[in-house]
């Protein structure tokens, strides 16, 4: 793992439905890290991810991705470097697992003269990596919640990007599937050297899976640091207005919230 900044957000301002959400925000993300953004509802977490991915047009500021100003890049050029999975991704009614994962190859279709067989090999490799190859021809609508989320992760993986943004990837999943998806992301982070930036609501899961945590409130970044630096009673009181009791996970020594009032 390096200390190189792969993504830098400088002086960015964002609005949603004519309401200023983020004003002159600065934040950087280190290559190869799993960075988790936490904060109360409505604080701007999802808005920030949408602004970085250009789904939401910024009003001012600069975003630098892999030393390149994103304003100078086309949508397809960005899609080769950065993937974004929204909170509630949906597939066409009759789309199969393979159909959805193949969408991740879209940025390469017009310029690469690859045979269909070559593209199938790439998609099959991705499906195998996320343990979905046997379900490749199944309709996505027939899958469990955890399997569906693996499909979306596979689509992002097929993009062959260095950075993946995920907005609450564990939403609507039961606890077992939450752990399954986060373990998959951790594995991809290690094996593919993938930089992962995600929003999570569960503080203990955020602490467990993050290398770096970012605390947001009222459209501002108030705290940044390791889980041990962020998961403290004063910081959680400031962010969430809770009185938290913090302990230590005996397995990985990460901080955990034992109770809060």
Sequence positions of predicted segments:
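Conserved structural motif at the start of ABC-family nucleotide-binding domains
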Residues: 7-9, 22-24
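The feature captures the beta-strand-to-loop junction immediately N-terminal to the Walker
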Residues: 38-40
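Helix-to-loop junction immediately C-terminal to a conserved catalytic motif
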Residues: 53
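Conserved ABC ATPase "signature" region
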Residues: 102, 117-135, 160
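Conserved ABC ATPase signature
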Residues: 114, 139-143
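Catalytic Walker B motif of ABC-type/P-loop ATPase nucleotide-binding domains
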Residues: 164-168
